[in-house]
Amino acid sequence: MTDNEVKHNVTKHGQPKALYMLFMVEMWERFNYYGMRALLSLFMISTVIGFTKATSSKIYGMFTALVYLTPVLGGYLADRYIGKRHSITIGAILMAMGQFTLASYELINPILALGTGLTLIIIGNGFFKPNISTIVGELYEPNDPRRDGGFTIFYMGINVGAFFAPFICGFLGEPTDPMNVLEAYKWKYGFMAAGTGMLIGLVWYLVSQNKYLGHIGLHPVTKNDQDEDPEEKAKAEAAKKPLTDEEWDKIKAIFTFVFFAIFFFAFFEQAGTSLNFFAKEATNLTPVLPIIGQITLKASYFQAVNPIFVVLFAPLFAKLWLKMGTKDPSIPSKFGWGLFLQGIGFAAVAIGAALYQANGPVSAIWLILVYLFCTMGELCLSPVGLSMVTKLAPLKFMSLFKGVWLTASFFGNLLAGWLASS
């Protein structure tokens, strides 16, 4: 199948069939990542590893920071040497190996299992993450009106995987009674479930890629490809010209937005550490519900709240910006609203923490509130980031400043680990 045939091999909704194949692969990869993420900080403070919450938070922050850094190298290697599709295969294999290594703590030293497993996941994510989204982009011509809708469908896969993972991996892996010896060592089943999810996605990808993708993403980008690419030609021409005062002002604006985004992501990533600890230690996990009666929750289940809110609210926010038309808030306004809404969320959980100090475990509503407002803040700020870069960055430095935007997540996660540890 030629590249052109791939782009025109569509469903009744007009989107390329290859999009839905990639949707499934991404869904299982995110199931793999978010299933592990829901358990990681709790696993590190368990009797298996025995870290303090401070140490656990620092390691978690470093891990999630590096997850955002390695895709820069992975994308470069795929473009120049390996090819995007081979990189996806390598990344999926490494991430699955990482999950099963995490689950091997009874066979090898638990600290060694933890360090090796996380390292494999970090490297695997670097090969996988940038290349699958790039292939989605290659399913469309640059000005194809289906492109935005296609990416919306693709990113829905992220949230579907992220929603189900905490329930399945948490149910299998998080002990209900840590004092029970058999229960205390069931973490491995959660990590094995996450790794199995990645293997399912990998098998689906290997079986389906030739049928749906043709030659798209199969080979590295050659010098001739770059010479024939109109965008690369435009960058080459722009590179010969010095930056104007207006471009320097836009660069300063980018760094200003990145600075504030660092703090947003630092608090947003408390979900995996301090909010996870709050769920485990300060939240009533056996509430009595009307009609249903008493239910038993696990701390890891709350990691599913953000993705379900994203699924519910993302279409509403998209319609809101569209409906506002020319009154659509500016980029600084959206950043401001994002930080403000996040602040409301953490004010709510602070009230919950005060009630816990006074009366013991509190209602889960306080955690749900912080996730609700943080999700609304995320929808104001996070999608605007790359869009802001493409609007403001000089053409010849476009790739560089896309990388600069990713550093907001990198430094934000480092700061998140430090905040949670203190």
Residue ranges of model-derived segments:
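Cytoplasmic membrane-interface "Motif A"-like loop-to-helix N-cap segments
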Residues: 80-93, 322-340
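Transmembrane alpha-helices of Major Facilitator/SLC transporters
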Residues: 69, 207, 288-327, 338-346
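Short amphipathic helix-loop junctions that connect adjacent transmembrane helices
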Residues: 38-57, 271-299
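Central cavity-lining transmembrane alpha-helices of secondary-active solute carriers
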Residues: 61-79, 163-165, 304-317, 407, ...
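A gly/Pro-rich, aromatic-decorated transmembrane alpha-helix motif that marks the paired
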Residues: 38, 72-73, 160-176, 350-351, ...
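C-terminal ends and interior cores of transmembrane alpha-helices
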Residues: 90-110, 337-359
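Intracellular loop-helix junctions on the cytosolic face of multi-pass helical membrane proteins
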Residues: 1-21, 141-145, 169-294, 317, ...
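Hydrophobic core of transmembrane alpha-helices in multi-pass small-molecule transporters
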Residues: 27, 98, 110-131, 358-380
